[in-house]
Amino acid sequence: MTRRRVAVTGIGVVAPGGIGTPQFWRLLSEGRTATRRISLFDPSGLRSQIAAECDFEPSDHGLGLATAQRCDRYVQFALVAASEAVRDANLDMNREDPWRAGATLGTAVGGTTRLEHDYVLVSERGSRWDVDDRRSEPHLERAFTPATLSSAVAEEFGVRGPVQTVSTGCTSGLDAVGYAYHAVAEGRVDVCLAGAADSPISPITMACFDAIKATSPNNDDPAHASRPFDADRNGFVMGEGAAVLVLEDLEHARARGADVYCEVSGYATFGNAYHMTGLTKEGLEMARAIDTALDMAELDGSAIDYVNAHGSGTQQNDRHETAAVKRSLGEHAYATPMSSIKSMVGHSLGAIGSIELAACVLAMAHQVVPPTANYTTPDPECDLDYVPREARERTLRHVLSVGSGFGGFQSAVVLSGSEGGLR
């Protein structure tokens, strides 16, 4: 079967420090961080009391009270990001065949925030097991189930083709775009809204990561807490947000006169069958994902101009990822800039993969590599070029974005400049 070429024609982003792609790119290109003390609830009892929050008010972005009540925060993020992406693509969904349009969105924790809130209501703050269901909000089931993420976006834009929610932990955003890529490339749809959303800054989610000491306890210096690849790194900073890309059959995009940012040229995902949170030091599974994505893109590792790292800022992840990139790219790894935007916008779990892909598309559009903020002290086991603290101009033709998720998920996406230059 001939695989169709898949174009990226629109981007929408809701991220800490930057709602909308102009603000998001400004934050990244300036190397600023969005981490601060948690304001969404009182974090005093937590080990890690900091996060990268979105300055988000639903009504500021065209979401009415009914939508805000019906949808959890993460779905609100996705609706705003999808609307921006569709506008950016200059795509009139009313003129598209709804059966030839899809929506594939990812999330790691779904509506945990709303579920936690309602449990407090119905159980009188956890004091009773015979819960009072009269206290529950009428939209609770729709608000917390992960399926709502994709169905709400599909409903908003009249999408009647394949609609699916992907939940593969912290690779959900990459995998959602990867699955959408296959749907377009294989001719099942002509256009697909693809991305992810999560709003995990809630007491129970923060406590979960506190329990395994995965998050940074640098509460006295939030701006410098996330330090991917730095020798003094001590965990990630929780984030939140959403990003949606419009993926289209390249010929379909050309026929309607759309501007094209770039193409999705390769995708792969593998599991490590090893440990829920542990990673093999050698990085074999991530390297296999990279190699397979490169094969699909018909590229050698030496063609990659920039690697967007998972770069969570935990000791084991950053060593594992460095080893994987060196295994796949060989000596070229040492000449390839590799940075982590989690140093600036935190780790939004399932959403971060799509947010990072949006950053990659913008990096290609501007021909600028975003930096790794807060990188000051080299780690002998992490010995690549992590673009410390300042953005860097560079010719970007092919970009690799990689992700790693609890549960052993390892994914990679390759983006390539489209013929005729970039948007």
UniProtKB/Swiss-Prot annotation:
EC number: 2.3.1.-
Residue positions of the active site: 170, 310, 347
EC class: transferase
GO cellular component: cytosol
Entry superkingdom: Bacteria
Key words, A-Z: Acyltransferase, Transferase
Stated name of the protein: Putative polyketide beta-ketoacyl synthase 1
